[in-house]
A protein has these predicted regions:
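A structural motif in glycosyltransferase catalytic domains
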Residues: 21-22, 29, 197, 212-215, ...
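Glycosyltransferase donor-sugar binding loop
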Residues: 40-44, 225-239, 255-256
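Donor nucleotide-sugar binding/catalytic pocket of nucleotide-sugar-dependent glycosyltransferases
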Residues: 144-183
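Conserved donor-binding/catalytic core segment of Leloir-type glycosyltransferases
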Residues: 7-8, 189-207, 213-216
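Nucleotide-activated donor-binding/catalytic signature segment of Leloir-type glycosyltransferases, i.e.
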Residues: 55, 239-260
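Short alpha-helical donor nucleotide-sugar binding micro-motif in glycosyltransferases
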Residues: 74, 264-269
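Membrane-proximal helix-turn-helix segments that form the acceptor-binding/catalytic region
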Residues: 79, 128-150
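Active-site donor-binding segments of glycosyltransferases and PAPS-dependent sulfotransferases
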Residues: 7, 22-28, 32-95
């Protein structure tokens, strides 16, 4: 009996949390001699050295447009699944690919279709999210019932998928941080005179940064400081949040942090 051929599709993951998810998945494939792993990625430059047992196929053009992305998911993947005779197909970025395999899985992490309070200001501030709000629910629905399992990170998202798409195979898979803490020369707040609250998230409407700002306003005199991982230039929503916090000395905009910096900020926070 031949090996299982497991394809991990993540052509849209290039930076940040999603790219970390990809690396965590690839880490879990180590020492699985009964399987051959093939990863479909935007670029394998960083990954090949970290995961030499994985075969990488690059699709650098897919991320450039939704037309190319949909063609990839519904046409390219189907052809590839037949050529390589894949047994398992893992879609890491929301859309269930059109493939010919015995076992198919999808990881869904975009909550846009379930957003309940989208105001006119939200639409103007982040029009891309409004498009996600309108169309992502339709994209989720295509082929979703053909999956062996649908993975999400949170219990509330599981309930929404079960309700909206009548699914019984939704699995909550919470992130597991297996990365050790490392010293990178950052100055530590060892005196603990101030409380540090670290909120690492991209500036998107559904991340509710307004709640952080309101809390910071109330707690200005309590030595409680909030640290955010953007700088206000990323999009209109980021600019709005930055402006709301412009007079608050207990809100700190750190900008983008790499994985090591993130881990160390976690360690140094309360």
């Amino acid at each position: 009996m031949g090996k299982n051929i497991v394809v991990i599709s993540a052509v849209n993951f290039t930076t940040g949390g999603p790219f970390t998810v990809l690396k965590n998945v690839l880490t879990a494939t180590k020492d699985r001699a009964e399987c051959k792993f093939i990863a479909l990625v935007h670029s394998s430059a960083e990954l090949m050295e970290l995961f030499p047992w994985v075969e990488f196929i690059e699709y650098p053009e897919v991320k450039s447009s939704w037309v190319k992305r949909l063609y990839f998911e519904y046409i390219t993947c189907n052809r590839l699944s037949k050529v390589i005779k894949a047994t398992h197909w893992v879609c890491l970025h929301d859309i269930t690919a059109n493939v010919s395999v015995p076992y198919r899985f999808v990881y869904c992490h975009n909550p846009a279709p379930f957003y309940k309070y989208l105001s006119y200001r939200d639409i103007i501030g982040e029009p891309k999210f409004y498009l996600f709000y309108l169309f992502y629910g339709l994209l989720y629905n295509i082929n979703i019932k053909k999956n062996t399992a649908v993975f999400v990170q949170q219990q509330w998202l599981k309930k929404e998928f079960e309700k909206k798409y009548k699914l019984k195979n939704v699995v909550v898979s919470r992130p597991e941080d297996i990365c050790p803490f490392e010293s990178d020369g950052l100055v530590r707040n060892n005196n603990k005179k101030d409380v540090r609250i670290f909120y690492p998230a991209v500036p998107r409407i559904f991340k509710n940064f307004e709640v952080i700002i309101r809390a910071a306003q109330i707690l200005q005199d309590k030595n409680i400081h909030f640290y955010l991982t953007f700088d206000g230039t990323e999009n209109k929503y980021a600019k709005r949040i930055y402006k709301l916090a412009s007079e608050l000395k207990n809100v700190h905009f750190l900008g983008y942090l790499n994985a090591t910096e993130m881990v160390n900020f976690y360690q140094d926070s309360d």
